[in-house]
Amino acid sequence: MARSVGVTLSEHVLAGLVVDHKLVNGLQRFPKDENDREALIDMHTEALVETICDEVLQVANGNKALASVGVAVPGLVRNGVIEEAPNLPQLKGARMRELLSGQLKQRGISAPVTVLNDADGYAAGMAAKLGKLDALVRVWTLGVGIGYGRYPFTPGVWEGGHSVVTLDDKERFCGCGGRGHMEGIMGHRAMRLRFLDMEPEEVFEAAKRGDTRCFQFKRLWHKALAAATASAIHMAGPGKFFLTGFNVRFVDMPMLRDYMQQMVKMSPLQSYSIEIVEESPETRVIGSAVSAEQAAGI
């Protein structure tokens, strides 16, 4: 059985040893404090690379004969290069696969390295978890930013979180600076910028109490999710969409379904479904390892 290491990079570095698409011995986390969500932002690229390699070495537990290493990062990744990373801007332009491979070889690990988008890693993890590695899986990750994950891997950009969902000139809260983006409405960072006097949790609580401004935003938030999902359906067809990430707690499924019904009217495209799944770091790590194994032809 192949022994691979999966790593995911977001607010923390999470790493785990994966054997036969299952996590072995739990996850390794950096930093150790789960509430420290700013540590990676302050680290330069070289320090991040060294940290990732240290975590890989620890979860390998002395056995350096790994089949592959998969590292999932937030941003636009092509051919091992991070071309854009709004939430970890120091990584922009980093030749991540090359840097990681070099550092791992210095530590005695010569396994092939795959660098992929973190949402794609989650989609691969969901496919492995469901035993559907031969099926199309699409995932929206609702967190600091918005990720769109797709499995199996298909060449393309797939930056679904930057889908344009409004033409309102005032919608400029996306981390990339673009106007009208889904992430500029739904992303946690964007919501904090919009409501400088309230946290996102307080906004949705106020919406429940009938606050007009907050309820209007709740509607906009769900319209953005519906619009991006409907666009994906109109481009690639219906099927199941999974919603995950720490902000799935804000999803009002009846409201979302109502907007979806208004936006998807062609009967052949109405066989879609939407399911909320609990945020799972384990699924992310397994998906990173599965993607690396497939890229290595294992």
Q: What would you call each of these model-derived segments?
A:
Residues 268-298:
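Conserved glycine-rich phosphate/nucleotide-binding loop
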Residues 3-75, 107:
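Conserved phosphate-binding loops in N-terminal lobes of ATP-dependent enzymes
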Residues 35-46, 65-69, 75-136, 252-267:
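Glycine-rich phosphate-binding loop and adjoining helix at the ATP-binding site
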Residues 68-75, 142-144, 238-248:
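Glycine-rich beta-strand-to-loop/alpha-helix junction loops that act as flexible
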Residues 3, 14-29, 37-41, 103, ...:
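Glycine/GP-enriched mid-protein hinge/lid loop-to-helix segment characteristic of carbohydrate kinases
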Residues 34, 38-64, 192-254, 272-284:
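Adenine-nucleotide phosphate-binding core of ATP-dependent small-molecule kinases
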